[in-house]
Amino acid sequence: MRLGPYQYLADMVVMHYHNSSLNDVENKQRRRCLVAIAGGLGSGKSTIAGHVRDRVEEQGLKCQVVTVEGFLRPRADLSEEQLNKRGAIDTLDGDAVLHMVQDLRDSRPGEDVHLPGFDEHTRETVPDGQVIQPDTQVVIIKGTYILANAQPWRKIGGLVDERWFVFVMPDVARERGARQYLDKGIVGTEEEAFRRYDEIGVYTNKYVNRHSCRVDVVIENNDDTVPLTE
């Protein structure tokens, strides 16, 4: 029987975890398995990560999904131009994201890790808004630029076990991106949503499509079939 794409990805993660070396030999503990999933606005990172998490947990491993949106730089530190395109790569604290991934890499099940979160309603970061639980064995880290080839982001790829990129066609990304702006209350009308995407979102998606590091899997998420390319 042919495996579905989410099950295939989950099986890869579980295999990585069980095949990882026992770095902490004295306590016989495997380190956490880390997966980075990148993709532009409207690519479906959150949906894919959620499906994979559920299937990983069905196989007996505790899995959590975290976002890097909590690492947005404070508004006071941004120029007017940056405020207008908040969410672009230069409005995120890339060094802090890199340190977060390193901390997760060095941590072991049995240790909790506190991370900043992001409130979708207020559009503000939340200190300690995300907590990796002590018994978590797999962490899926999602972020638009998590696998960008710009410094310091490009160092992240060497710290994770799996690197996935979600690709969508431009017209699909535009429709989904505009819908996200509406659903999150960033704009009030469909016309404003498409205008914002054409002024901001399209450049974000072009950037990540052109400036991402080498990945292990490309996920083409243009419809419900979600084909994979290794």
Label every PLM stretch briefly.
Residues 45:
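Conserved lysine of the Walker
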Residues 128, 151-154, 182-230:
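Small-molecule kinase domains that catalyze NTP-dependent phosphoryl transfer to phosphate-bearing small molecules
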Residues 1-36:
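Extreme N-terminal, non-catalytic leader segments
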Residues 54-64:
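Post-Walker A helix-loop "phosphate-sensing" segment adjacent to the P-loop in P-loop NTPases
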Residues 42:
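Walker A (P-loop) phosphate-binding loop of P-loop NTPases
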Residues 122-183:
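ATP-dependent NMP and nucleoside kinases share a basic, alpha-helical "lid"
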Residues 64, 73-122:
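Conserved nucleotide-sensing/catalytic segment adjacent to the nucleotide-binding pocket
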Residues 48:
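Hydrophobic positions on the alpha1 helix immediately C-terminal to the Walker A/P-loop
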